[in-house]
Structure formats: C-alpha cells, structure tokens
Swiss-Prot record:
CDD domains assigned: AmyAc_GTHase, E_set_MTHase_like_N
Residue numbers binding substrate: 256-261, 320-324, 390-395
Pathway: Glycan biosynthesis; trehalose biosynthesis
Gene Ontology BP annotations: trehalose biosynthetic process
Localization (cell): Cytoplasm
Protein name as catalogued: Malto-oligosyltrehalose trehalohydrolase
Active site: 258, 295
The keyword Cytoplasm is assigned to this record: yes
Catalytic activity reported: hydrolysis of (1->4)-alpha-D-glucosidic linkage in 4-alpha-D-[(1->4)-alpha-D-glucanosyl]n trehalose to yield trehalose and (1->4)-alpha-D-glucan
Gene transcribed to yield this protein: treZ
Phylogenetic classification of the source organism: Bacteria, Bacillati, Actinomycetota, Actinomycetes, Micrococcales
Example of a GO MF term: 4-alpha-D-(1->4)-alpha-D-glucanotrehalose trehalohydrolase activity
Keywords from the named record: Carbohydrate metabolism, Cytoplasm, Glycosidase, Hydrolase
Enzyme Commission number(s) from the entry: 3.2.1.141
Amino acid sequence: MTLVNVGPERFDVWAPDVSSVVLVADGRQYPMQKKETAPGSEGWWTASDAPPNGDVDYGYLLDGNTTPVPEPRSRRLPAGVHNHSRTYNPPPYRWQDSRWRGKELQGTLIYQLHVGTSTPDGTLDAAGEKLSYLVDLGIDFIELLPVNGFNGTHNWGYDGVQWYTVHEGYGGPAAYQRFVDAAHAAGLGVIQDVVYNHLGLRGNYFPKLGPNLKQGDANTLGDSVNLDGAGSDVFREYILDNAALWVGDYHVDGVGFDAVHAVRDERAVHILEDLGALGDAISGETGLPKTLIAESDFNNPRLIYPRDVNGYGLAGQWSDDFHTAVHVSVSGETTGYYSDFESLAVLAKVLKDGFLHDGSYSSFRGRHHGRPINPSLANPAALVVCNQNHDQIGNRATGDRLSQSLSYGQLAVAAVLTLTSPFTPMLFMGEEYGASTPWQFFTSHPEPELGKATAEGRIKEFERMGWDPAVVPDPQDPETFNRSKLDWSEASTGDHARLLELYKSLTALRREHPDLADLGFGQTEVSFDDDAGWLRFRPVSVEVLVNLSDAKVRLDDAAGDLLLATDEGNPLDGGSLALVPWSAAVLKS
C-alpha cells in the first residue's frame, strides 16, 4: 500500500475509463502515459516529465476536457473540492508525541466532537483550546466527526468526496497535525470518523476516472462504492491506504467506520476484515494500539469477534439498542423505532446481553433481527454505547437534544445508566452540561438546485414519519448551522453546572472502579419493577439504583457505602434507600 506518493510517481492517477490524461501543474501541462501494472490494477497513468518537488497546484485533464479534476488522494484542496489539488508531501511537521503510548479501548470514555460546531470559530485550533476541559471531564478519546473534503463550507462531514484531505475551513492538514499532537500531549487519544459506504453527490469526480461506484446499486445513503465488482481491487486499496493515512501519517489512535450496515461487499474477505488486519499490522509496527470501531445497526457481533474464528477483528462496535432503551426509559417516547423498548425488561436485557434484538422480532423492521453475542468471543467493553450521539440528535426533525425536553433528574438518570454500564460510554459534545443548543442537519451546497432538493428531501422524509413539516429547519439556511454551535457559557450556570459536576463524578467513579469495564456478558445482575419504575444492577464492586418514575420509591437490601447520589434527597437509612423521583444512587457493594 502507498501511504504517501513521493518522488517522480507522486502525480500518478488511476483512470482506467479514459483514453488520455494530461497533468496540469502550476499552469504547465504534462502528458501522461499508461503504466504497466499487475492484473487487477490496470489503468494507472504516470507522467515521465513531472513537476519538481515542492508545493504545486495541480489537476488532470481527461480525454481532452479543458476543465481539470482534482486528484482523488489530494492531501490539500485550498480552494475547495471542485478545484486544483495542492501537494502536501512529505507533511512538513515535527511531531512531539514520541512519548505517547496510546490507549486500549477497554476502560475508556469517548467524546464525539464536530469541529465546525464545537466552538464559535469552528476550527481545529479552536477545538484544541478545549483539550484541558476534556481532560478535567475525564475523557480518554476524542472522536472527531469526519473532517474530509466536502461540498460547500459547512457540513456534518458524512457526505465527503475527498477522503484524504482535511477540510480547509477547519484549518487543513497542518491544523489537524497540531490538534493530534496537542491531544497526545494532554493525554488524550484521537479517533477519526470515516465514511467508506458512499460518496457525496457534488465534488465527486470518481465516476469520471473509473469503476469506483456501483452504478444502479444504491444503499440508503447514495451509490455504493465498488468493493467487489470488476476493477474493485484499486478502490479497496484506496480505502486501506486512507485508513493507514490517519493512523500512520496523522498519528491518530483509531478509526470509526460510519454506517457499516451500508457497506456492500460480497467478497470472501470483507473490507472490514481487511481493515481489522491492517489496524493490527500497524499496531504491531508502531507498538501503539490502534482502535477500530464500527457503527452498525445489524446487531451482528461478528464485527468484534477475532479473525481466527471468522470475525472481522475490530476493537468495538456500537449498540444502538442501549441508546434506544435508555431514551425510552427517560423520555417515554415509544413511536417508530422506539416501539419495542417500552418495558424496563428491555433495559435490563441490554445491560446484561448488549442487544435487545439478538435474533428476536423487531416490529419496526417487520422481521427478526440480530444475533446473540458469544461471551467467550467478546466482552461488553467492545460495545460502544451512548444516550445521545450526532445521529440520534441530528436525525430528529428539529435536532433537539434530550436536555431540551427533559428535567435535570431525567438527564442525571440517563448519565448514570450510561457511565456505570459495563460497556464503553460515548458522550456527544455538550451532553455533559445539558447544552440547550440543538444539533441540526446542516449543509452549504453552493448549487441552488442541490440545496433546494436537499431541503425538500429532508422535509418529505420527516413528513413520512409523522412530523409537522413546518418545524423542520432548512439545512441550507446558515442559521441552522449557527444554531447548532455550542454555547460554552452555559456550562457554568445553574443546572448546567450541576450536571457537569455529576458527569465529572461519574467519570471519576469509573476510574476508581475499573471492574465496571471488566465484566463478561450475562454477568451483570439486574432487577426491576416496571410498575414502580425502579431498576437496580450490580456490576461487581458497586450497585446502581435508579428511580425512573415521578414517584418516590424505597428500595430495601441496599447495603454498602453511598458513593454517589444525583439528588441530596436520597438518604440511605440502614439497609434501605429512598429515591426521590428521577434520581439514582451508587453504592459500594
């Protein structure tokens, strides 16, 4: 695999579907010739007379076209995804993280962060100013939402079209290097979200070059990328090299794979298995753990099983069932995909087994779904869980957070359930202080017709789900983006500050009781009363008692020292604990 294209071959491009390619670099044209390559990788072009080393703006003229297209492996696109690439090889940065030893996933806490809305400036340098805050909060990994090149000036990042570049609005690759280096100096790992299931609609020049997409084979997000058809060897290498770019050249500690349930690959060796092997190989070479995590709604534990038992060997995968069970328990919402999660028996099952649907019938899907996790092949820490994330907030009609409709007590209960679970917790930025700002779906397509179609499609999508179309914000309106930016001043006021202190106490509790993340599936003891609205579970050294109702409850046999209470009105009297409505307590068992 080619991590960095350097020397005379740095401008090579794969374009098997064209008959002529001309490299345009700093205004000069360099005719390219086809290279002789091994079977499966035919279609590479090279320029025998190429520009000298140094910063060069360049692109490619295909089949006599007078408008150049950028390189698919562009490290920099200073003028956006429709314009010339700029060389960035080798990366001119002196890393200072030689003493960084990395982190394994087990026992850690992840913080999801979108660069553009995390601060008023929306840059990596500005986000870097929050590192000490995250250390104080007790975070281990910062998971950055995609930073790759996309159409327009602001976007979630999941419709990227230039996977090798860092969006210039965030500061470009130099700012990215500074951010990762500073994170490591602060003791924080970095996980980079990537999207390998589709490409965005505009700025995507792959179809002009070769069979990179499976035309007519769309997933729910767009045309599927070509991972198993004719000519797919090179695109698979493109993906593997991209993952190696982040964990190698950019020193990140892990990669988060977006929506792997939308990755279409019918080869005998799935691309995720190849990625798992790549991560292990780089870990072996560097001596640093490289954490690969899959977002998946398949409830298929094969993702985290070892490769020697036909698994993919990833370090972790999401359990959306945990989010849904907690959401229903604290909010009472039971429509749509929340419909199977109404009983506390569901939350109890998820706490013990990781999934609700592990082969059971899903009424939302209209079919049976998932499979059980074999406890001899995976442990609960391999499941990444949350009570909110970018999808679960942003894909609601108004992008509303739990904090915009729930009380302090309900938010506190959700926090306790998440941060004392046997899984790996993930927070979404601002959750820890109950941010009142929404996180809405926003785009900035410069093409009016695409912007209009995006807005209309969003409204129709929520109309079908029963939402009032009048409440759905226009993703193209700049105010939709601006509304989604965090207001950090909230964190020091009222219940926001109170909730933040609770989160800090909970992260400290996890550090003081590492056995919370050292259980096997089925080992968490859980009891509950649906009618009374309480649930209690015992992850080894502590017992967690939760009141999920509007009435006060008294729980007997509550032995042990009180380690944490979300409300001062939760007195422990001998072996009895009184829980006020919507509160929780943690005892040393």
